[in-house]
C-alpha cells in the first residue's frame, strides 16, 4: 500500500474528502447516501410512481442510469459532435414499469438531461455530488459482477477464464475515480493495461505527441493503482518494470498475465463496499431517516440494517425462481460475487448456491421481452448476521508474504481456512522464468510454493449478531472444509456484453 500518510479510507475516496476522523467520514458518507435518497424520492414524484412501483428494483435501475447518463460529460460531448440517427444527445430515459389493472406495463420515458441534473443537484444541496454518482456506478458494477461471467473478455486479452475471481469492477466506467479504482480487481486492472498496450502495438501514434503524453500518464497511473493492490515486494517490483518500460509491448503483456496468475494465490487488496439500489435509500429517507446526522458506513453494519427493514420488489420472468433472484441481488448489494459461498451462506443464513445452479437471468429486462407474462415478487435481502467488509486479499499472515484463497476474493473479514490444491495452480507457472523479470518471477513462484494449505485467513475474525452494532462479540464460524465454494465454477451464466 502507499505510505500510511497518503492512504485514505474507502469512505474518504467515496466522498472525495481529505483525511477526516471517523465521525466526519460517517457524516460525509451519510450526506452522500441522503442525497441519493432525496433524488430518488423526487424522481418518483416526477414520474408519478406509486409506492409499490417506486420499490421496484428495475425502476430504480432506470432512474440511476438516467442520472449517470446525464452527468457523463465525455459521452454527452461525443454525442453532440457525432449525432447518430434517433439519439437526442440532450435527452436521457429508459423503461419505467407501472402496475395497471393487475398487469405490468412498460413505458419508455424521455427526460432532458439538464432537468435531471437540476433535480440531482437540488437533492444534493446544489452540488454536483460526484461521490453519489460513483456510488451508483459501483452498485451497477457489483450487480454485473454477480450476474455475468467475463470469460470472453478474459480470453480476448489472452488471460485464462479461471481468473474470473480477479475481475471485480470490470464493467466500471473509466470516470469512476479513486473510489472506483479501489474496488477494481487485479484482473480488471491487468485487462485495462493489456488493452492499452495492444492499442500501442497496433497504432504507432498511440504513445506519440501531445495525446501520447496524456496516454503515457494514464498508463503509469494505472500501473501504480495495480502495484498498490499487490502485497509482496516481488510482485510490486515487477509492476515497476512494467510501468517504466520505454515502449510497452508483448514482454509487458506476458509479465502482466504472469502477475494476474500469481494473484490467484498471492491475493491483491481489493476494496468491497455494500452499495444498495437508490430506491432503498429513498425508502429510508422517506421514512424520516436522517443519514447525515446518524452517519453511515459502507463497510460496517449500516447496509445490513437498511436491508433488514426495506421491502424491494423485482419483476420475475415466467420460469425464474424468486429465491434465486433474491440471492443474486443480495450478492450484488454486498459486493459478494467473488466471496466464498460458505462464508456468504453463513452470513445470509440461507444457502447461497453457485451461479450455474441459479434459475434466474439478469435483473434488467430487455426491451423486446414480453410484459404480458411478467410477474413481480419481493426480494429477500435480509441476513442472519453481519460482517465487516475487507480490503485485504485475505492472505494468511501479512508480515510474511503468503497465500490467500484460490478462486475467491474475500468480501467479508471472517476467518476461513484455505482448502486448495496448490499443485493445480502451480501447474500454471511451469516454463517461462527467463527475461528481465526472471528473478522476480522466481521469487513469486517460491513464495507461492511455500504457502501452506492449512493456514487460516482472517484469524479470529467473525460475524456479528445484528443487535451487536459495535461489533463487540465476534462469532467465528467453522466451515466444512472439504471444498472451497466459488460462485463461478461449473458455470453457464450469460456473458456481459455492453
Curated annotation (Swiss-Prot):
PTM notes: Late in virus-infected cells, may be cleaved from a 56-kDa protein to a 53-kDa protein by a cellular caspase. This cleavage might be a marker for the onset of apoptosis in infected cells or have a specific function in virus host interaction.
Instruction: Kindly list the GO CC terms recorded for this protein.
Output: helical viral capsid; host cell; host cell nucleus; ribonucleoprotein complex; viral nucleocapsid
By its UniProt entry, which SUPFAM superfamilies does this protein fall under? flu NP-like
Annotated region (Disordered) at: 1-21
GO BP annotations listed: symbiont entry into host cell; viral penetration into host nucleus
Keywords, comma-separated and alphabetical: Capsid protein, Helical capsid protein, Host nucleus, Host-virus interaction, Ribonucleoprotein, RNA-binding, Viral nucleoprotein, Viral penetration into host nucleus, Virion, Virus entry into host cell
InterPro entries, alphabetized = Flu_NP
Main localization is virion
Is Ribonucleoprotein tagged as a keyword?
Answer: yes
Which top-level group of life is the source organism from?
A: Viruses
Cellular localization per UniProt: Virion; Host nucleus
Any one GO molecular-function label of the UniProt entry? structural molecule activity
**UniProt entry tagged with the keyword Magnesium:** no
Motif interval(s): Unconventional nuclear localization signal: 1-18
Q: Where is this motif: Bipartite nuclear localization signal?
A: 198-216
Q: Could you describe the subunit structure of this protein? A: Homomultimerizes to form the nucleocapsid. May bind host exportin-1/XPO1. Binds to viral genomic RNA. Protein-RNA contacts are mediated by a combination of electrostatic interactions between positively charged residues and the phosphate backbone and planar interactions between aromatic side chains and bases.
Sum up the protein's function in the record's words.
Encapsidates the negative strand viral RNA, protecting it from nucleases. The encapsidated genomic RNA is termed the ribonucleoprotein (RNP) and serves as template for transcription and replication. The RNP needs to be localized in the host nucleus to start an infectious cycle, but is too large to diffuse through the nuclear pore complex. NP comprises at least 2 nuclear localization signals that are responsible for the active RNP import into the nucleus through cellular importin alpha/beta pathway.
- Give the UniProt family note: Belongs to the influenza viruses nucleoprotein family.
Name assigned to this protein: Nucleoprotein
